[in-house]
């Protein structure tokens, strides 16, 4: 019955529901969206950010500069009227130090308040740094949540799936975003 004909509207789609349940169990998450309509990692990140943030909210990247494609979504490059910044969302960035988080700056900034979402990019992207391992991710999430448990922690986990024993949602991340175009961890991020 998982392969029954469907309308395309998502009603009574047992196969999709089962697939998403499997994904949520594998990644230790409350729920999962696994959809062919989400075309890429950047598309998934865009949907997530616009779904979680609204006018006046502040987003902070704690792993330095994001991927080039995400920069235009945020409004750091290009001149899109549809960027987060053009929609009134504030963006801040904290750089990594020696392939690790700047824990002191992060803690200091979190204590100041007025943060809706903290984003971190697990893979190195186009930079020369190493990918962030799960222990570092767990440590920084723990420090943030000790100060403010209501801040949403979002991990850009593209290229990070199945490369370690735990996933970001298993160490305190509220949400992680990934791409099915990438080979779920078989790449060399």
Task: For every predicted segment, state its role.
Residues 2, 9-14, 31, 39-189:
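Conserved PLP-enzyme active-site core in the AAT-like
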Residues 20:
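Generic structural marker for isolated residues within well-ordered, non-membrane alpha-helices
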């Amino acid at each position: 019955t998982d392969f029954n004909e469907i309308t395309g509207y998502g009603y009574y789609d047992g196969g999709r529901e089962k697939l998403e349940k499997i994904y949520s169990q594998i990644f230790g998450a409350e729920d999962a969206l696994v959809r062919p309509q989400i075309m890429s990692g950047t598309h998934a990140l865009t949907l997530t950010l616009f779904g979680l943030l609204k006018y006046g909210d502040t987003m902070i990247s704690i792993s330095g500069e994001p991927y080039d494609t995400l920069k235009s979504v945020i409004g750091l490059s290009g001149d899109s009227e549809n960027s987060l910044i053009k929609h009134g969302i504030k963006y801040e960035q904290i750089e990594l130090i020696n392939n690790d988080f700047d824990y002191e700056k992060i803690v200091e900034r979190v204590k100041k308040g007025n943060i809706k979402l903290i984003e971190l990019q697990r893979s190195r992207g186009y930079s020369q740094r190493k990918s962030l391992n799960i222990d570092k991710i767990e440590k920084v999430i723990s420090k943030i949540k000790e100060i403010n448990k209501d801040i949403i922690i979002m991990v850009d986990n593209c290229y990070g799936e199945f490369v370690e024993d735990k996933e970001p949602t298993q160490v305190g991340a509220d949400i992680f975003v990934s791409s099915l175009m990438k080979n779920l961890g078989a790449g060399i991020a």
